[in-house]
Every structure is written in structure tokens, then in C-alpha cells.
Amino acid sequence: MNFRYQPNQQPYQPPQHNNNSNNRGIPTNYQQYPPQNYQQYPPQQYYQAPINPQQFYPGPPQQPNFVSQQTGPIPQQPPGFNNQSPIPQQQPQQPQQPQPSQPSPIPQQPLSPQSSSPSSPQHVVIQPNQPNQQQQNANRKQSALKPSVQHNTIPNIPRTHSAPPSLEEQQQQHQHQNNIKGFTPEKRTPIQHSPQYVIPPQQFGKPIYPNPQQMYFQQQPPYPYYGQPPVVPVVNQMIPQTTVKKTLEIIDPKTNEKVIITSPPKSSTNSTVLPTSNTSSSSSSPTNANGSSTPSGSGYVTSFSSGNVNLRKNKQSGETTPIKQDAASTTTSTPATPSSKAESTTEAETTSKPSTPTTVDSVSSTTTPDKSNVVTAAATTTAAATTTTTTTDTTTTTTTPEAETSTTTPATEVQSPVETTKEEQPKEEVKPTEVQPPVEPTKEEPIKEEPTNEEPTKEEPAKVEPIKEEPSVVESTTTDTKEEPIIVAEEKKQEETPVTPVTEKKEEPIVKPETPVTDSTAASTTVEKESTDSTTTATVSTTAAATTTNGKVEEELEEWEKKGEEDFNIVQSSDSSTSITPATSLVFRNSGEKIVYSKELMMSLKPKSMEEPTGPLKDLKNQIETNTNQNQLNRSGNKIGGNQQNKNMGMGGMNMNPNYPPQMNMKYPPQMNMKYPPKNYNNQVQGQQQQQQGNPNFNKYAPGYQYQQQIQQGMPPPTLQPNPYQPQQATYGITFSRDPVQPSISSQPVNEKRWVPTKVNALDDSQKVLRKANFILNKITPEKFDVLTEELLELGIVDDEKVHKGTIDLIFDKALNESKFCTMYTNLCKKIFEFEKVKKEIAKRAVFEKIGVIETENYHKMSNKQRDEFDQEHNVKAVFRTLLLSTCQKEYEKIPFETVDKVPEDLKPEEKTDFEEGQFKERKRIFGLIKFIGELFKQQMLSEKIVHGIMVSLIGELQRPSEIKLECFCKLLSIVGKTLSQNEQASKYLTSYFQRMQQLVDNSQTLSQRIRFLIQNVMDLKNSNWTLKVDESAKTLKEVEATQNKQEDNRKSNPTGVKNTSNVKNMFNASFNFGGPNVKPMMAPPMNYNKNAPGIKPPAQFQPKPYPYNNNYNNQQQQQQHFGGGNNMMNNNNNNYNRGPMGNMNNNMNNNMNNNNMNNMNSNNSTSNNSANSEIQKKWDAVSTSITDSINEFLELKDEEEFMECVKSYVPSTDLYPHVISQLISTACSKQKDEPLIKKLIFASVFDKKLFTTAQFKSGYELFISSLPDLFEDRPSAFKSVASVFYSFVLNQEGLITITQFANAFTKVLDDCGSSIPKILFEFILQFEDPKKAAQLFVDNKVGVQGFFTEKDFSKITQTAISYNKDLQPFFDIVKL
């Protein structure tokens, strides 16, 4: 009947196989359990959850069909099958626990070869064979098959680890299996697989939990001629899944007889993978059309086995029947010819069946060669032992003694009876010479075995697997009765080996031995690598079933460990025991793709505690403690006993066990366990030592395999306690029988951002030159400028264009980041420019000599553009300046003037701090660029036109300009202003600049206070002839030392001239001293001299001593003589106060000894004067605010009497009157509009009201002059007001001060005020209607103007004055310098 899937119907239901002959009436709601095998660890694979979990097919069907599961398109349902029936749930108890399952190894019914097309392997048509119905019924009665679908079976306990179950569980399973008969489905009409099943409907999603049957066995469509419709329909997966092993029965199409197959021998080889190409399909060759093959596009390899079937048959028949196979477990390997794929190579097919000991006379083996390299039917593993990633080491090897007959054809070459091992032959195919072609071609006929009187053995179909050609396989054929195994390491290959048809073979029934077999007999007949104990007839079925199950567990564990060690091939180790004579021991390696396990399932199955395992692992630990014995093997493949430590001890007493020492709580992933073994560890030597010690399983790299064998075979308990860390080792532990190769460093992932040390040898010439240039620029200073510049030019930085540009970038970046040395870097650019210009001129001359005189004359007649082209063509053009200016232009265009001052409002406090820091760095770089451009203009490397363009763009905005632009404009103008002012054409631009600046200053609402002061400073700088108060440029050490020495000399010669604004008492002290710190002696004599104020006397503590007073006064007289002149009043005072024992000293100022004595006496009185000044300062601080308010009130009310009354009431002592006078003068200079009122108030207070004496007035204006540095710092243009106020004091009728006093007072603060003092002189002269009158005043009083200038300006006083104002020229024409 045809099964057709209807995509529009309800979710897919399993096909119900109509068994007309034997319908067992199993209910529809029967829940099929997976095969009872607890030794396999479930591969960790999750499936996508379906749209509706209820729609996913929960499990196997109700009927006990034993058809192997398949992968590929979903088979169709037979007509009449109810698709609307409810779907039973699968394992509702624990839906999230993956359950191990394995395909049932029940023979499938052969199909007609005409039922499928070679060109469409995906649409498999399975046809039943009705004549074979009776044989199936007979087989059911003869053999007891595994009741994998019986609804009364014991519930399958889900296992989450690879440990074996308990003995009680196994006994229950085996009893149940022995009591239930197997069932083989009836043959039926072919199943039409249509292309619609390639993409299933949406309702067939993936389960929300992993399906055990789909996890373990990748579902594939049946083979073209031997397939059966699957009992459990597998939802077509939308994504590729991992390969899963499956089992199919092979039926000979010619005789319709099952080819009996046996399990392969346990392979001690390394892990070899036999990948198969996706192109191996039934349509690839005619040969595949006649044999079973994997459908194209599946990409999976399937192994077949029927070992469990034979065991069940043996148990039903009550006889021990080890399935015999070809004498040498023949494997033939020949490379496939490119012309025809009909003759292809089938690799890694080994034959061996676990069986009980048999009699010698009843065993025979045959080997049949095939023209097309036929793989014998007995070359497969058991259903669970066939994995796609690791080899199986669980089956037993059938051996024959000398009396055993062996039949081979003469065409087969006999291999040498020597065990050989080939290690690591990458990508080396098996040569065709390994199997000689038959001399006499034999017809491909099945060799049937003669049946005996015993019940005939049911034939099993041989399983053929399309094998990937990845590792090479060794062929082993036998012609002698005594055979040695031939083992060759397998390496990966890339070619495809198509599947060839299988020959028929009949086996002779084996007579059951009456007596139990002894150890010696077992050694000569059956070798079990898991145990060397003798077995009896009573335990034959249990041992065989356990051995078959063990293969599953070992294969599962190999999959488990293969994940962590996919890059390493485990070296095959030979298994040679003195008491064992194996007849055959061939390499067998299942092929396929590795299974990828999800991290979630791995973590869920791992025990929570390494000391106390929980769940099934705890049961496993209890079983180990009670069921192990001395001969038991641990998970590392070593015996557990008193001498276990000695067995693991290597040379030098070192424990060479890979799992020693146990790592407590070290949860490493599988990739890190034993990935890098001990340095001197030789796996082969260690393997031989273990082999000599009687451990045939030393090469078992599956940790759970030994426990499984020991528990099932009932070994006595061991003497040692199990390792508490074994559960973790069972999960993650990986034991190798060879030294894994450490991967090369180049294969490791590389971080692109890692730091890599620079290798000088790897640099080219230009990079080396740039490195040297950078070293020089890091060391360059103004002091070493000339030397290092020469070294830089000698590197040839102008020869190579790359080096040329790189050097410019280095200089440019340093100039912007180190603005203090900007002048030095511009000088360096000038040097390089001149050097390049000279070098190019020399090269140009050489070019002219080559081209001749005529061409040279033509060159001079060319235009500038043509000359540039000529120079560029002959590489004689200087390009340094062009590249430098281009770099400046690019950097200037990058300045974000609009956003550099803006701070986003939505920033957090910490983000705002970082943003402001970034703004500060950006502003610093902008100002460095502006300064660099200005310095380049001063070096004449930048044209004036470019500078004007920049300045216009910065200040030319009509509306409120950006403050950052105005700041850049002020900095640039302060640098280039002096150079521009010397050009008459630029004076027009400067005039317009200052007019715009004045407009900005006057409009206080548009700009902040800081920017307005900054603009005012530039305007004052222009008025001061562009002379900076502080030179911020870099200086040499000599220049710094000279400046410091000069300042020190000034402090020593004129201590009152030192600016000290932190303490006003020092200013007050300095205002009264001309030669020493004594103050009050200047006040006392005038007070005594003033007859109009007899009541005012100085306090007692201010009474002067004779020596300091005379010294101070004499110093004053000397200064007056220096400027030439003085008034009569001071001359009269000279006679009155030049008295005492030391009076003669005043007439001789050249006596150094006397000067030193006077200085010492002055220093003795400094302490008392400082204490007095401190008290005065405290008093003034208390009343200064009241005085300031009184002055402001006077300016509003203009009431002199009121002001005077306030002063008398607020100021408790006359000692504070000089501070009041200083405050009045400071107010007059600050408020030019109120200057006449302040001057009128001062005159009235001194002369009319007599509030202040003349001496107090002198002390007051001297105190004001000492504060001029602070005034000029705040108001650079205050010199005009100062000159105007003092002009009134000097030229008034009463004569408050003389011209000499005026000159002496301002000379003291020359060093602190800088260029402001000459400006005060110039403005003072300009106050006269005629400068000539001012000159006459200076000449009459013998006052010179040199005291207003520094020494370096003596030579250019007249030039400075005329540049300030041309009206000053008549004055300097009269006054002789």
C-alpha cells in the first residue's frame, strides 16, 4: 500500500502497518518505549519547539515494528490511515529528560530493485516481497527479538550520564526480553516519497525537548532496495542535524535471504573518521543502484548490525551460536576509478561477532573476493556500537584454532602475519597493490553455509555503509589457519568511496557445547578485551547481550570525548597477551560527523558536587563500591588494586597516569583535559607496560566502558575505594593512548589591538629616518637648537617625499601641543626651508648645465606657472613651505568654532567633567595653531594676505561674534601686530580692526567681562608699541639666569620696587623708604617742621633714631641730586636733620664701610617697624570699606565737609591718613569722569581744611605708586589717568610735589610696571600745551628722562617716543639724553 502525506491535514501520525497474517491487536494508545539500553549517554542536541507542542509526534507507534529509523523526507501514510486520530504523548513523566534509544536491529524485508529510480534517491519506493512472508513467520517463532515496543515493558528510566545501570535493572530488562517474542512487520506496497516532504508544513516544528530516538539516530530514508517504511515518522528538520547512527538489515536481492552479519572485533586503533561525501547516492553509479546507499544530499553515514538479533535467536533456540564470518574478517580496499564508480572502495569494514566459546570442529570461515571489491557481509558493528565519530571497542573477536578450516581464493594476497602500525600518514590513499587482482576471475556468487541438524540460523542482511574516505583502512585477508592481526593507523582522506553490492553468505549452524568452557579454551577461541574470565553456557545470552550493549556505551562515550579532542588522532595500540592468540584483529572505525552538544544540557547533566554525586551518578558510585574487585579497571583503563600506583609509575618514580593527580573542584572543559600531556610522556611505552601487566584494555579511551563490563559480568568488588572525582572524569575526562600534538601558535586567535614590539629590521629606510627625526625633535631645546638642527638636516629629510611629509607632520604636531616652544619650531621650519631652497638651487644649476645655455635662457623667459612646471618635472622645486602651509590650512579648517564652547545640558556630572576636559584639550590645540600661524608670519613663511584673511574671518561677524573666535583674534593680533604696524599698507587694516574692537568693548551686553578685558589688553598693547609685559617664549638657560640675576639685583638695590600685593603692610613700608625699611622717620620731621599743626605728634614707638633717619634722608637727597634739583624746603630740611655723631657720613656716599654699617642699623630696626606696620594694616582693613563708601557718597553729594567729617569719625588715628589719600588718588585714576572732583577734594583737604599734612600727602601718593602694578594689571590703559592726576599735583600753585619727586617715585616701580612707566612720562609731557614747556621744566630742575626707561631701551628712547606720538619729538630735541 502507498503511504501519502497530506500537508493540509492534521499533524503527522505514525503509519499503522496492516498485518493481515498476524495482527496482534495492540491498542492505538500504546506508548512505545525506546530500546532498553541504559549504557548510552544521550547526545546533547536540542530541537526547536513546535508551534503547538501537542502537535509534535511524541514517540514510536503502537505496533511493535522493528524497522530502523530513517532520515530525510517524511514517509507517507498508507491510504485509509486515520490522520485525525489523537496523538499519544511521549513520556509525560519526564518530558525534559533525553532518553537513550537505539534502532532495533530487526531484519528488514527486501524490496524489488525496480522500485526506485537511480536518478532520484530521495524518492524511495519500498516494495514488499510477499513470498518471504512465511520465512518471517518462521523467524518470529525461532528467535526472541527485543521487545522494544511492548506496552507492558518496564518503564525506561531516563539517564543523563554514560554510566551503566544497576544489576537489578539489567536483570529485569533481560528477563523481559527473554519472555517477549519479536515482531517483524508485514511486507507492503512501496511507499512513495514525493518532493513535498523536503519542506514539511509549519505545524511540524521541532519538539520543545530533545527526542531521544532522533538524538541518537539520525533519521535517513531507507535504501533504495532494502528499506522499510519507518515506524516512527520523524518530523523533517528545518536545519541540519548531527549525524545519528542507524541500523538497517541487508537482504540479498537475488536469493531473498538475509545476509548474516556479526559485530566487528574490538578496535584498538586510534580514532579514525571515514567521512562520506554528499554525492554518494544511488544516482552516482550503476553499482549503487543495485546496492544500498545513502540518498544524495543526506551527508550521513549509516552502519548496520544484527548482532542482537542473532543473540536473541540463540536464546530462543537454546544453543550458543557465535556467528562466524570470513576467516580473516576480510576487508578489501581498492581505489575507485574515475571513469566508473561501479568499482569503488569500501573501507573500514571489519568482521567480528561477540559470541560464546564454540567447538573447534564446528567453526569454519571463508573469504570471498569480489571483482568490485565487495565488502563482506560480516563487517559491521552492533546497532548501538555504530557511531559516526569514534571507534567501537566493545565487541569480541572470534578466533579459530589451527584445526579451524579456512577457505580463501587464490586471488587474494596473504598479508604478513605481523602486527604493523602506521602512524600519521596524512592524506595517503591505500595503494591498489595492497590487494592483488584475482588471477582467475570468479563469479560473484554467494557462498552458502551448509545447515546442520540443528535449527537453521536465520540469515541476517549484511549492512553496507557508504564510507567516507577520510582515514585509510588496512585490508586483511587470511589464507592460513593461524592468523596474526594486521593493524594500520588510519589517516583522513578527502575522496569518496561509493558503496558496492554485498555478496551472499550462509552460515553453518554451530553446535552448542555441552560442557562449560575453561579459561584456556576461551583464550584459544574467544577473546574479550573487557574480561578474561571464563563463561558458561548458562551465561551465554547474558554475556552476548551485555557485550552488544557495551558497544553502545563505548561508542557513546567516544562521542562524548571526541567533542573535546577533535583535532587529535588516538594512536592505535596493539593488544597482544601471552595467553591470547587472536585469529583476526582488524581496524574498524565508524565514520560520520561529530555531534555538537549544547552547553545547557552539558551543565544540566554535570553533578553539582564532585565529592557527593547526585542522582544516577550516586547510584553508579554505590554499584562501584559493591560490585568491583581486584581485576576491575578504573576509568583510565588501569586495574584497581593494591599495585595500582606501581602500574602507573613511570620512569623515575613519576606517576604517568593521565588522570593523576585528581583535580579537586577544577571544572575544566573537555578541551583542556590532557590536551598538553607531560613533556616526556611516551604513550606507546606506557601502553606496552600496561599490556605486559595483563591489562588488555589499557588503550581504552572511553572511561565508562570498563565499569560497564565489570558490572554486567559480575566481577568481585575491588579492594580500593573508588575515586570521588570519577563522576567528573566520566563526564569530562579524556585519556589518550598517544601524545597529542600541540597546535601551532599561528593557529591561535590573534587580537588585532595587541601591542607588538617594533622591529627595527622590519622597517624600511624612510621609516628609520622618521624614527631618528622624532628622536631629535624630542631632544631639541633653544639651547641645543643649532646642533640638533644640523643633525636633523643631515638625515636627508628633504630628499625623500615620504620623509619630507612625515617630518612636517612631526613638527606640526609638536608645535600645536607645545605652544610654549612654538617660536623654536617655527625657527626650525625656517632652517629647513632655507636648507631645501639651497639644495634645490644646486640641483637646478646641475639641470641647467645638462640642458644647455639656450634652454636656460628660455627658462628665465617663462612665466611663473611654466617655471613651476619645469621645476616640478626636474624635481628642483622647494616644496617644504607648500606642504607646511597646506597642513596648517587643513588643520585650521577642522576647527569647530560653533561647537567648541557649547556644553550639552543633558550630560551627567561625571560626563560633563570629561567633556570639559576634552574641550580644554581642543582649545589648547586651537590656540597652539593660531600661535604657530602667527610665528610663521613673523618668519616670513606666511604671506600677509593670508593673515589678514584669517583675522577678518575671526572678527568680521556683524552680530555677536563667537567668543572663541575673538579670543583667537586677540592672540593672533598680539603676535603679528608689531610686524603689521611697520607696514604702511597694513595700517589701514589695523585701524579697522581696532575700531571694531572698540565697538565690542563699548557694547558690554554682547560680550562677557573676560573677553572685553582681553580685547582691552590688546588695545593697550598696541598703545605700548606691541611690547609684551611678560615674554612667554622659550629661553635658553643663560637668558633665564640673566633675568633672575637682574631681578635679584633690583631687589637688593631697590627693595621697595618689588611688587608684593599679598601683604599691604609691605607696600606701606615701601612707600616711605628710599634706601631702607624704616618708614616713620619720614613722617616725624615734617610734622615737627609744620608749625601749623603743633598738636599732631607721632606716637612714641615711631620716634626715629638718628642713624636710620639720616640714612633715609640722605638717600633721598642723593636721588634728588641724580635728577638735578630740589626745592628750597627740602634743602632747608637737609640742614636741620643732617646732625649727630654720624652726620659727616652723609657727605661721603662712596665710603662702603659706612654704607654697610648703616644697612646693619636699618636691619636692626626692621622688626619693630614690621610689627607697627602690621597693626596699622589691621586698622586700615577695618575702616577701608567705610572710606570707600564715603568717597562714593561724596561723588554723589559733592559735599566736601561731609566727607571730612566721615574721615574724622571713621579713622581713629592719623597714621591711617596716607591710606585715605592713596584711596582717593586710586579712585581718581579709575573714574576719569570724577577725576576733577577727586583732585579738588585732595587740594581742599591739604591746603584749605588742613585735614592732611604735606608729609601725609607725600606718604599717600608714594603708597599709591607702589600699587601701580596691580592697577596696570587690571587696567592697562590707566597710565593716562595717572599722568593726568600727577600733572595736577606737580603744576598746581601750592606745589604738592616737585618734578624731582615725581621722577623719583615712578623710577622705583619701573621693573614691576614695565612699559607703563614710559607711557606715563609721554602722557605727562602731552599734558602741556607745548612740549617745549615740559622740556624746559625738566631742564630747569635738572631731571633726566633716563630713569623712566630700562637700560636696553636707552638707545631707542627717541624712536620709541616718536613712534608713540610724533608730538613728543620737540621735547626730546630739547632734553639731552
UniProtKB/Swiss-Prot annotation:
Cellular component aspect of the GO annotation: cytoplasm; eukaryotic translation initiation factor 4F complex
Compositionally biased spans, kind Pro residues: 95-110
Region Disordered: start-end pairs: 1-189, 259-563, 683-702, 1041-1063
Record flagged with keyword Protein biosynthesis: yes
Biological process terms in GO annotation: regulation of translational initiation; translational initiation
Single GO MF descriptor: mRNA binding
Compositional bias of kind Low complexity: 1-57, 84-94, 111-137, 168-179, 267-296, 326-412, 533-549
Domain MI, residue spans: 1182-1305
Residue spans of biased composition, Polar residues class: 297-323, 517-526, 1053-1063
Top-rank taxon, per record: Eukaryota
Compositional bias of kind Basic and acidic residues: 420-432, 441-471, 480-496, 1041-1052
Protein biosynthesis keyword on record: yes
Keyword field: Initiation factor, Protein biosynthesis
Similarity field: Belongs to the eukaryotic initiation factor 4G family.
Function as written in the Swiss-Prot or TrEMBL entry: Probable component of the protein complex eIF4F, which is involved in the recognition of the mRNA cap, ATP-dependent unwinding of 5'-terminal secondary structure and recruitment of mRNA to the ribosome.
Cross-referenced PANTHER family: EUKARYOTIC TRANSLATION INITIATION FACTOR 4 GAMMA, EUKARYOTIC TRANSLATION INITIATION FACTOR 4 GAMMA 2
Name of the featured protein: Eukaryotic translation initiation factor 4 gamma
